[in-house]
Structure formats: structure tokens, C-alpha cells
Amino acid sequence: VNYYETLNQHANDVEITPSETSYFSTPGNTLDPRIFQGSVLRNVVREAILTLLYNHLQLGYNEPQAWTNVYLAGSGVSFNWEAHRDPADLDCLVSVDYVQFRQSNQEYKGWSDREISAEINQGFRNELYPRTETFMGTFELTFYVNVNPNIKELNPYAAYDVVSDKWVIAPKAETAVSNPEWESAIERDRSMATEIIKRYASAYEKVKGARNDAMRINAETALAHAVHQGTLLFEDIHESRSNAFNPGGAGYHDYNNYRWQANKQSGVVPALKKLSDMAKEAQESFAYETYGVELPDVSTLIRRAQR
């Protein structure tokens, strides 16, 4: 079995389908009552989040309460929460005191802040996310460590300190900006994504209808090329968004955030993410079929070798 054949086994129908996004919704008058009682985080939500987080971190690290601050951030804790999304997004930013982390976990003494945050995030993705994608049956709860521990410098929509049980950045009623130049750039993304999905769909149909090995191989190659291009475009849109929430970014009003949100609303982001996930799943399956184990990526292997 080669990689192209493995990718074909993970292939499925992909379409660009518009959907609602909180960014373009009309701000409400209240915060989400499922999470807040008035402006205060419901205690049952607070305890569930901290229990999930600390139970996970204690499996791999010492004294997590000593080196973490925990914040709910993003649209889920803003006045723009009412857009119909199932599940709804709930983002939890974990701020790490890296000096204290190294004191509590001596085996990481030689690691950089970025390497530590990457290691913790990988644990969140692999081990915690499968248990939080349907948090309280309603929310997709995502934990994430930003290498910058200063929450105010990340320009979030709003930020609630879960440990101290208070607002650090109070939410404001925000409305989406309108900029003709931005729309032109978004249209280029849409056009490119539409062409990629069209070529992917054509290749997928040819793979299913191939009558001989030559036809199948050609179709699988075309499919893999479309998946690769879609993955690159998704990563560009996704990774560029982080610029909005770093020092120098404009947060909610930043172009990179608008680009993400507009492409999410049009259906471009979900479609490209399907291609990206498809590639990742195929790579993991191919590694397992070839080597008998799921191989970590190169950066992970380097980080672990330094421990």
C-alpha cells in the first residue's frame, strides 16, 4: 500500500457550504445563559473546565496549578454568541508561567517557551480534545496554550479568568467591519478554494470509476495534489489569523481575523479543513501500516529527544 492509496481510502465528498458565524451576527443584550449567570461564570461550568484541565495536566506534569492561568476567551464569552452553531465554540486559553513550569518540571529545564507550549498543545489535541468536543453536550471546548502568557497582549474579544472567577477583559458589543479591499482578497481565497474543491471532486469521481490501474493511479495522484493544495491554503488562512491575536494585531478588527471569519461563513474554511484532516488521517494510517506505530511529526521527535 502506498500513500496515495491510503489517502484514497480516507477520501469522501467535500463541498463548500455556507454557514453561520458569530462574527457576522447581531450582538445580543446578554451573555450566553448556558455559561453565565448574569456576568458571572456558572460554578458548574467553572468546576468542569478546571477539573478537565488539571486532571489532564497532572498525568504528564507536576504542580499544574502553580504555573497556569486559565481564561475563557473568544466569541463564546462575548455578546456575539447567538449565531446557530452546533456545537458552539468555547475557547479556553491556558497561560503558562514558564519559569515556574521549569522549576516544577526539571526535565524541561533546557526547553524554550515555544517548545513547552507546543508540547502541551499536542497533549491537548491528542488526549484532551476527544473528551471535550461535546462539552456539556452543547459546546466544542478547545484548550490552547499561546507562547505569549500575557492575555491582554493577545487582543481577545473578551477574557474571563476561570481560576480567579472574574473578567480580565470585559466583553463589548462588536459588529463586523466592512472593507472593499478586504472583500477583494476574500474573493481570491474563495475562487482558489472553489477551484481546488472542483479538482478534488473530479479526481475523487475518477478514482471511484477507474477501470484499470493506470486510470486509478492518475486519479489518485490528482486527488493527492488537490488535497495538498487545499491543506496549504487552509494552513495559510488559519495560521495568519494568529497574527490578529498577538502583539501588534488588532484582534477582532484585524484583517486576518476577518479573513478567517469570512471564509468560515462562506464554507471555504470547513471544506479546506476536511481536506487538511483527510491528509493528516492518511499520513497517520500510512505510518501505522508501514511501521506498525503512529509516528510523531519531526518537531515532536526533536522536542522529546531533548528531554
PLM features: residue spans?
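Enriched but not universal
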Residues: 1-10
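Catalytic core of pol beta-like nucleotidyltransferases
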Residues: 10-87, 95-307
